Amino acid sequence: MTEHLPMPQFGPLAGVRVVFSGIEIAGPFAGQMFAEWGAEVIWIENVAWADTIRVQPHYPQLSRRNLHALSLNIFKDGGRDAFLKLMETTDIFIEASKGPAFARRGITDEVLWEHNPKLVIAHLSGFGQYGDPQYTNLPAYNTIAQAFSGYLIQNGDKDQPMPAFPYTADYFSGMTATTSALAALYKVQQTGKGESIDIAMYEVMLRMGQYFMMDYFNGGEICPRMTKGKEPYYAGCGLYRCQDGYIVMEVVGITQIEEIFKDIGLAHLLGTPEVPKGTQLIHRINCPHGQLFEDELDEWLANQPITAVLKRLSELNIASAKVLTIPELEGNPQYVARESITQWKTMSGETCKGPNIMPKFKNNPGKIWRGMPAHGMDTNAILKNIGYSDEQIRELVDKGLAKIVE
């Protein structure tokens, strides 16, 4: 890698250069993770039109912090040349587009490897780089990937399926790009040979929706959707109402079932053929007493405040938690102790508040060192970093191939 762009050195990925081209959430989320873990991350934007995420009032300050902003037309003339020159000093390149869009425009894996044989290339799209032509070139967002993967149909309630929000497929796919690119980089460091990764968002969600799908693939059984937030198969698991709000709980384990049955007045069922000794889960459908257990549990919970319920469930070693509202997060003692929510300065000097770096590395922690850069803010510095003169940069700008902030 060439000399770093100006930034502090920190985290487990200090010294790694990552470049990404993509808008909105999925692809940029991958880049964001690298940036928070110490990599030097360059965000490529269109010259004429900035990333559409910029229209949001607050989210971009989180999703684009720690980045370097390059505004460059990478598919045309001198802009393409500058992009390929940048690839020579890049460790990981992530692009999010419709199928093989880069290859269609002449930037194939082979072209990139001609300029950098060690380059890790991550292609992120809705339907993959190859397959049935009626799908590979289609646009895809969160809901599209959820719908096509079998993930969406499993969510919602018995009356209607519904997507899991916010933007689950985007974040899962972005994190898949991050982890797979790191796996590829590890191998490149051993072999010296680059890698290309084909990440289809629908396949990511297919994998994430795997749990109950296996019952269908191997037995033809379709799992029912939830009812009012309760786990479809197992009683005592899911969302429950108390006097003053909601909790979630998971009644799993021999001792846990025995003790909760005693508390709610069902001790006489323990040791029966339907609830034999050693029962670890109560099947909502197959157990004749599954619905009775749910009904008694609902009544027991509805007549108590959350604090009392959580205290008793903790005594019984039953996993549970209050469903926190967003305003409750900041003052929660666990959030405070771990600084899960933090503040940083935007490029305009304003204070922004949001989630802190995760996960927490003990010896090489991540950090927030910069707010979201303006459109084209670092174009000049990046082009100079890869060897361009002031005159060459001005020529790109005059031709509309690059944008700089004066």
Swiss-Prot record:
Recorded catalytic reaction(s): these are: crotonobetainyl-CoA + (R)-carnitine = crotonobetaine + (R)-carnitinyl-CoA; 4-(trimethylamino)butanoyl-CoA + (R)-carnitine = (R)-carnitinyl-CoA + 4-(trimethylamino)butanoate
An annotated GO cellular component: cytoplasm
Name of the protein in question: L-carnitine CoA-transferase
**GO terms assigned for molecular function:** L-carnitine CoA-transferase activity
Positions annotated to bind CoA: 98, 105
Q: What does this protein do?
A: Catalyzes the reversible transfer of the CoA moiety from gamma-butyrobetainyl-CoA to L-carnitine to generate L-carnitinyl-CoA and gamma-butyrobetaine. Is also able to catalyze the reversible transfer of the CoA moiety from gamma-butyrobetainyl-CoA or L-carnitinyl-CoA to crotonobetaine to generate crotonobetainyl-CoA.
Which residue ranges traverse the bilayer? none
* SUPFAM superfamilies per the UniProt record, alphabetical: CoA-transferase family III (CaiB/BaiF)
Where the protein is mainly located, per its record? cytoplasm
Cite the EC number.
2.8.3.21
- Locate the active site: 170
Location within or outside the cell? Cytoplasm
Matches recorded under InterPro entries? CoA-transferase_III (IPR050509), CoA-Trfase_CaiB (IPR023452), CoA-Trfase_fam_III (IPR003673), CoA-Trfase_III_dom3_sf (IPR044855), CoA-Trfase_III_dom_1_sf (IPR023606)
Q: In which pathway does it act?
A: Amine and polyamine metabolism; carnitine metabolism
The family classification in the record reads: Belongs to the CoA-transferase III family. CaiB subfamily.
Q: Spell out the subunit comment.
A: Homodimer.
Biological process terms from the Gene Ontology for this record are: carnitine metabolic process
